[in-house]
Amino acid sequence: DAVLAPAKRLEQMGFSVARVQPDRNGFITAAALEQVMRPETVLVSVMAANSEVGSVQPVAELARTAHAAGALFHTDATQALGKVPVNVVDWGCDAASFSAHKVGGPKGAGALYVKNRTPFDACMLGGGQEAGRRSGTQNVCGAAGFAAAIQVAQEKQADEQARLGALRDKLYAALAEKPGVRPTVQVAPGS
């Protein structure tokens, strides 16, 4: 809902929104994205990782596809942070959003990366803090807690990837023993 709910709101405001159908394994391909892009497309927004099916999108490839069509690219990297390497610059993101609680940080804290010179209108008006991009008093404790949580998550990332991969492989093996049960998403063991 983090990406879909704002998309629905934009539709209610009169914007045209296209949804890309993922392939049977939950991945959005550049070809599928290209099929829904139109000359008037201004923004592409993709979840970097899906916590329900486990797919990690080819974010850099999707960003290149969006940029080639003249659109800005945003990723919701909340589910990816601390689980897979995240580098918004290498990915080519114009914007990326994160939430602290997914890496053990304080609830209510988050971060929005916006690439320098990316067009951006403030959603909160007032005192003009953050170069006019976000007014209001900053949650310093929340930001510090988020920073600490990211550091811990990055230090434990390789172990967490191995742990989650082992759990997934164990689940797939147990399900494979059940007659008539088959996974709806195919993931290579150890990935």
Please place each PLM-identified region on the residue numbering.
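Pyridoxal 5′-phosphate
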Residues: 1-191
